[in-house]
Amino acid sequence: MAILGLGTDIVEIARIAAVVERSGDQLARRVLAPAEWQQYLTHAQRVRYLAKRFAVKEAAAKALGTGIRQGLAFAQFEVANDTLGKPRLILHGRAAELAADLGIASLHVSLADERRYACATVIAEG
């Protein structure tokens, strides 16, 4: 297998907090897939959860070589966790089609956060 794409994104959590303060859950509704939205509603640290998901989705779109455009939407990238808590990506719609067209067989996710920032890296392998 070969690396077909790499994307990294860093998000200042305070910026996400400011958007949520101004517009309520509008950003979360636009960014989160349905399963993520349900987790968001009950999460103890909603802003941090949203910032981390945002970072992963931006990194994934960069790994596909497009960013969020050309028919891609944030909600087409769903972040889930395995039984050990490791993040993984599930692609839907145009994101899944694009990954298949590019020959991407797997996406590897690294996600980190600390007090001020959330950072994600996605490697596309095929």
Curated annotation (Swiss-Prot):
Family: Belongs to the P-Pant transferase superfamily. AcpS family.
Keywords: Cytoplasm, Fatty acid biosynthesis, Fatty acid metabolism, Lipid biosynthesis, Lipid metabolism, Magnesium, Metal-binding, Transferase
Binding site for Mg(2+): 9, 58
Tagged with keyword Lipid biosynthesis: yes
Enzyme class (EC, first level): transferase
Gene3D superfamilies given in the database record: 4'-phosphopantetheinyl transferase domain
InterPro entries linked: 4-PPantetheinyl_Trfase_dom, 4-PPantetheinyl_Trfase_dom_sf, ACPS, Ppantetheine-prot_Trfase_dom
Cysteine pairs bridged by disulfides in the record: none
EC number(s) recorded for this UniProt protein: 2.7.8.7
Localisation: Cytoplasm
GO biological process, one term: fatty acid biosynthetic process
Catalytic activity: apo-[ACP] + CoA = holo-[ACP] + adenosine 3',5'-bisphosphate + H(+)
Role summary: Transfers the 4'-phosphopantetheine moiety from coenzyme A to a Ser of acyl-carrier-protein.
GO CC, alphabetical: cytoplasm
Top-level division of the source organism's lineage: Bacteria
Needed co-factor(s): Mg(2+)
Pfam families given in the database record: ACPS (PF01648)
Name of this chain's protein: Holo-[acyl-carrier-protein] synthase
Primary localisation category: cytoplasm
MF GO annotations: holo-[acyl-carrier-protein] synthase activity; magnesium ion binding
